[in-house]
Amino acid sequence: MRVDYLKKLGPGLLFAGAAIGVSHLVQSTRAGADYGWGLLWALIIVNLFKYPFFQYGPRFALATKKSLLEGYFKMGKIYLWIYFIINIATMFTIQSAVTIVTASLASKVFGITPDLIIWSLIVTSICFSILLIGKYNLLDRIIKWIILALTLSSITAFLIAFTNNTSSLSFTQILPEGNKLIFLIAFMGWMPAPLDISIWHSLWTIEKNKNSNKLNTKEGIDDFNIGYLTTVVLGICFMGLGALVMFNSNLEFSNKGGAFADQLINLYTSTLGEHFYIFITVAALTTMFSTTLTTLDASPRAMEKTSQLLFPKNKSFNYLFWIIILSIGTSSIFIFLLSEMGKLVEIATVLSFITAPFYAFLNYRLVISNQMPEKFKPNKFMRILSVSGIIFLLSFTIGYLIKI
């Protein structure tokens, strides 16, 4: 692959960095720990049905030179107001959730202090500094190295676990029943990521094309496909780690992300040896740091654009304003509401999950509307997959609401 083409890669890797987080390290691994390879079908099918809606982010941005948010606004101001309210309701707790898992892993890897509040503030400060000093261009460069380290360490950790496995492997697929069905619904809802990340991707694509390494539509979709394939492969790797190292271990696993990640690392090293510790810790830490960094960039970027469209006369609601607000809000949750973190994350998770059909419908409607140039509209296969995906997401959302 040519060096100049590698320089053009960016938004798709940022997507991967944002997507490969709690959904992979915690939920995919948990699926493997509890069901072995039994939920592999769910991982594959949900990635298939969500694919078009994520892809429409860069497709629309490159074809129209506008973000999905601008498309929503043109379809109707009400859609943007809904997004604004949902984002305000979820962005602080989601940022806090990914940061606390990163802090837990950093505490384990670097020691210094076991205080998660201190580590959370350190992680937030590092990410804030990277984004404030280097802005998008530094983020674009850093994420390529993070994703490379993440991919190599995760695949290596999986291969080590696979080659050291002495138990027979079962690929019998399972459909959980009763209360266990709730885990399946949540797993599929967050794999590989909530659908509003398609909005972030469209904004990153617009930002990427402000520099000299501009993407055309084909290159942009190729860039996305590389990022998306990475999320799928690593989803399988983390499920495999759970299946190979944690399944049938007769241990009770924590429902808290940081504690579960700690259990994974401890069990991995105790099963395979201390000399393999570095591979699983690098995989886990880079997984969560990439999510923390990209999320801290994306939410303020999305809120800046939303504010520009909804409040055109107010110029103060810019990127700097929102990243400061998000950083302060996140830090405040660590300091004052850490004991309520579980409930706050649950609320944010439910809101993000039940809005998936909403974003799927909006993205599909947008790319077949007259806002989209005819030659860039999805083909027949993508349209069929999109309609099937909307039905699929709607069905699981209704199923989730019935069960809770």
Where are these regions (language model features)?
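Hydrophobic transmembrane alpha-helices that form the core helical bundles
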Residues: 63, 80-111, 120, 288-307, ...
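Hydrophobic alpha-helical segments and their helix-loop junctions in multi-pass secondary transporters
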Residues: 148-175, 184-203, 359-374, 396-404
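Extracellular loop-to-transmembrane helix junctions
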Residues: 30-55, 70-74, 78-80, 182, ...
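Juxtamembrane transmembrane-helix boundary signature
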Residues: 15, 42-71, 82-94
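Transmembrane alpha-helical segments of multi-pass small-molecule transport proteins
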Residues: 12, 84, 109-132, 148-159, ...
